[in-house]
Amino acid sequence: MPACRAQVVALVSGNGGVGRSTLATALGSGLQRLGRAVTVLELDPQNALHLHFGLPHDTPGIGRASLCKQPWGPIAQPGFCGCRVVVFGETDLQQQEDLQRWLKQDPQWLAQHLSRLGLSEQATVIIDTPAGNNVYLHQALHVADRVVVVALADAASLGALEQMQRLLAPYLARPSAPRCHVFVNQLDEGSAFSLDMLDVFKQRLGEDGLEVIHRDPQISEALAFGEDPLDNEAVSLACDDIHGLCQLLDSPPNAP
């Protein structure tokens, strides 16, 4: 089966509550505005992404479709600005355990499903993975062209960063390694502690590959109502940050 030709961006995090799904939603809209054909794929059994896109809770998803050996294309839903959304969907505990067992045995599971979507080289897939070390994370890392580690400027994210770096190390050592970025999300420049923590991140990682997204309640408010956060015409540092990050992700992975 031919490999997926689309660029694949995996959003990962060492700990939860960092705004990873929110960021996946916003990046999907932003990259679509740049002319990419974007598919936002939820690879997380928590099944929360439908809330951000204003989709019904019973939207069919990849969990049950995969167990029934059904293709993913027909369950894609319209998202913001013309992008497509493929949610995980509702699953019970037994279904989740069955799927995780399957994924452990078949590391090419995700690659095969992406290949069947028939995406072009102008397409981008944004994968929202669960926090921490899990089978969904490793499936995404097998196919990723870029890996975005999402963190907050706090001690919990800094503590989880070392574990995530260890998890990523084998994938980043491959000949065709993905490019890795760290996005510090929801930075509050009015907080001296947050700025101090950002400095610690910079000392740990260096400037290269470290990006910042400022805190903006308008982003969360828009998503709470199922609205595109980038449709807001008001001046927003966070929206400017996201547009800039979309430009970064739209550039060739080996670009400086």
Residue ranges and their predicted role:
Residues 37, 43-123, 224:
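P-loop/Walker-type NTP enzyme "switch/lid" segment
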Residues 55-60, 167-168, 198-200, 227-230:
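Short, hinge-like loop/turn segments at secondary-structure boundaries
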